[in-house]
Amino acid sequence: MRNTFRPSCPMLALTIALAGLAGGCNDSGVNRDNPAEAPASAPQNVMVPVLSADENSLVLVWEKPESETQQVVDYAIYRQGERLGLARENQNHFSPAKPYIDNFYQRIASDGWQQPIDLRTFTVTHLQPDTEYAFTVRAVYADGQESPDSAVVKAQTRKTPHVIEARTFGAKGDGTTLNTQALQQAIDNCTVSHYPQGCKVLISGGIFKSGALFLHSDMTLEIAADATLLGSDDPAQYPLEKGYYLYPYSDHPQPRRPPSLINVLEADDKGESPAGTFRNIRLVGQGTIDGNGWTRGVKSGGEATIIDEMGNELPQYRASNANKVGADGILAKHQTEAAIAEGIESNSAYKNRRSSLMTLRGVHNLYLAGLTIRNPAFHGVMALESKNITLNGLVHQTFDGNNADGVEFGNSQNALVFNNFFDTG
């Protein structure tokens, strides 16, 4: 992660929350325990975030004990009394943020001045579909002893969904074929009316170029580890009439924006949709969503990637502006130029006609996990007027991406953000 400034108190709190656990409000759509049942020395508010359970796994999150008589060094997770493991070791497998956090405390902030981040999540795997399980969590102390059990949290895995392979509808992962129509057909066919047990669209095995896609309620979109969803660089693939208004202002109306690469939007978007307009949407997988917004390399001929402190590659994008987008942009360039050709002033074209990676509006119960998100022409993930949102284990690689915020929550409630790695700014 890049260290370019000393964080303010609010920013430091945000960093801690995003790396560990950021809690929402009541009515958060999670399976949670009864805090009154948990001893003060036990972990509190154990919960399973909304939609985090699939047919074979689920995620547990919790808060620290209300009273700590001893130093807590870890947490132990139990299923029906059987010890599953420790949170810290589990995080090594499921949190892209943890190696960087460990490195920070071990090598950069070894003097102990900074408040340590307490990681409080655990991913449970090897479960059976459509089965209820009961879990408890204990704090582990420096001497190896454990706290009393938390209150019990019960959760049920999902039924095994029907899987629609994107290739079934003719999608080709060759990196050049335009797959917008094929992928949208797969999405449109993935409905509970067709598949009452649930449905998932799977994109796997290649680079799938596409324009704007539109999701609907009660579905999962999975991008496998061997797949990339690559945004088309053709502005026509993001038709303005299918776009959205960022705000519903009437006194000072905002210009309409083109749709993002992935969208949850009403067809006649007017700048707001109440949570519940759409419901129960999951975007998951170990694959990549690439907006194809900007050229690689800080300057012409520069390195497309750098190696960070953990030995991982970080893509390098071209910092730019309205005057330089023609030289630095890909989709950003083509969309801006197309708007200027329509007679729109260049600054306005640059500010309002670039597509983001995701615009997710009016969703009640939204879960994103595992994906690598990079190179939008405009913003990253935007969750607008939504409720019960979980972002788990995402990798955001949008540094110097010209307005490429990592995540935006607009007029939304009950957000949990944990295990995310952010290289943004």
Features from the language model and the residues they span:
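Bacterial N-terminal signal peptides that target proteins for export
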Residues: 2-12
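C-terminal motif of bacterial Sec signal peptides marking the signal peptidase cleavage site
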Residues: 21-24
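Extracellular/periplasmic carbohydrate-active domains that bind, remodel
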Residues: 26-425
